[in-house]
């Protein structure tokens, strides 16, 4: 846009500022306390599945692409992808397609330096594995699997689980849990990705088992500065057994993490602040990103969390619970 010089400094300056106003992007800081509204359950597992859970979501070409874990009536795990949809209200009618391979607790993102989509997951041929594709909407169009991480952790009944992958300008980072009160990290040069992180890792958070249980996710905060440049959420188990999320922040992906909204009564997201009436559990999911790439960027002005919940009256074994998707939207 071209601006013409005008006489009369006050009037011309006012017009100039008004003209510029629409081009100024508002920036929001992460809140110190969180309060949400919630949808009802958004989709029901198709016949043969008892649960849809462990969601990963990207928005590409204006549509949500969601992958998830499934369980059957015996508690066996598998994985699936939804047909791409524009609005959360469309999720119920979106197709549900089983993957021809088991990609449990998936992480989906676009690796921009190599122009390739990556699907990472657990319980493949390595501790964590990945596949690549040019079209993530083709649920069974993925490459053969490759090793993402080969390390083993001790002091865990599950082993390493619930990975997430994120990158900055120079490195890619792998974060994961172990149902044991610890969060772990591994890293590699971004130039070597996609590839294996190898077997080395470090323990970056340690606490009570129920306080740092599983489902770790890490994000770049759009416009974030200082200690709030990066956001981590970790699933915890509350005093009555219900699941909720605690949050942590950091100034760098390779740095130290500081607790932010980390108590059961003032969590990042949980029964205390979710606004959900159909579930008492806010469990394994993914913040909606404003960029599908490896930076895992979220907009603090428009935070939404795709999560798994279930009917509070269902008291089955964890792997038989009827988990379904719901979405939280942060109150502004």
Swiss-Prot record:
Its EC number is 3.2.1.55. It is an enzyme of class 3 (hydrolase). One of its GO terms (cellular component) is extracellular region. Residues 1-26 form the signal peptide. It comes from the Eukaryota. GO terms for biological process: L-arabinose metabolic process; xylan catabolic process. Pfam families: Glyco_hydro_62 (PF03664). One of its GO terms (molecular function) is alpha-L-arabinofuranosidase activity. CDD domains: GH62. Keywords: Carbohydrate metabolism, Glycosidase, Hydrolase, Polysaccharide degradation, Secreted, Signal, Xylan degradation. InterPro entries: GH62_arabinosidase, Glyco_hydro_beta-prop_sf. Induction: Mainly expressed when grown on xylan and much less on L-arabitol, L-arabinose and D-xylose. Expression is under the control of the carbon catabolite repressor creA. It is found in: Secreted. It catalyses: Hydrolysis of terminal non-reducing alpha-L-arabinofuranoside residues in alpha-L-arabinosides. Transmembrane segments: none annotated. Alpha-L-arabinofuranosidase involved in the hydrolysis of xylan, a major structural heterogeneous polysaccharide found in plant biomass representing the second most abundant polysaccharide in the biosphere, after cellulose. Releases L-arabinose from arabinoxylan. Belongs to the glycosyl hydrolase 62 family. This is Alpha-L-arabinofuranosidase axhA. It comes from Aspergillus niger. The gene is axhA.
């Amino acid at each position: 846009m071209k601006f013409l010089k005008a006489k009369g400094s006050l009037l011309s300056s006012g017009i100039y500022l008004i003209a510029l106003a629409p081009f100024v992007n508002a920036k929001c800081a992460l809140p110190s306390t969180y309060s949400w509204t919630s949808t009802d359950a958004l989709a029901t597992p198709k016949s043969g599945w008892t649960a849809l859970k462990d969601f990963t979501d990207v928005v590409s070409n204006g549509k949500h692409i969601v992958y998830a874990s499934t369980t059957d009536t015996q508690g066996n795990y598998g994985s699936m992808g939804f047909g791409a949809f524009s609005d959360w209200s469309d999720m119920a009618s979106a197709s549900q397609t089983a993957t021809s391979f088991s990609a449990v607790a998936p992480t989906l993102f676009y690796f921009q330096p190599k122009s390739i989509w990556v699907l990472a997951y657990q319980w493949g041929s390595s501790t964590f594995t990945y596949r690549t594709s040019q079209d993530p909407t083709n649920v069974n169009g993925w490459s053969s699997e490759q090793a993402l991480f080969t390390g083993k952790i001790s002091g865990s009944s599950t082993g390493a689980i619930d990975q997430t992958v994120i990158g900055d300008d120079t490195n890619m980072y792998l974060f994961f849990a172990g149902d044991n009160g610890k969060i772990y990290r591994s890293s590699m040069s971004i130039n070597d990705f996609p590839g294996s992180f190898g077997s080395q890792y470090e323990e970056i958070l340690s606490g009570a088992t129920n306080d740092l249980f599983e489902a770790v996710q890490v994000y770049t905060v759009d416009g974030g500065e200082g200690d709030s440049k990066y956001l981590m959420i970790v699933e915890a188990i509350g005093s009555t057994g219900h699941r909720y999320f605690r949050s942590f922040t950091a100034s760098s992906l390779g740095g130290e993490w500081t607790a932010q909204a980390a108590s059961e009564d003032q969590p990042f997201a949980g029964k205390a602040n979710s606004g959900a009436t159909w579930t008492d559990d806010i469990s394994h999911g993914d913040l909606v990103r404003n960029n599908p790439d490896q930076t895992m960027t979220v907009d603090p002005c428009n935070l939404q969390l795709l999560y798994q919940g279930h009917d509070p009256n269902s008291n089955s074994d964890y792997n038989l619970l009827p988990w379904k998707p719901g979405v939280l939207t942060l109150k502004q």
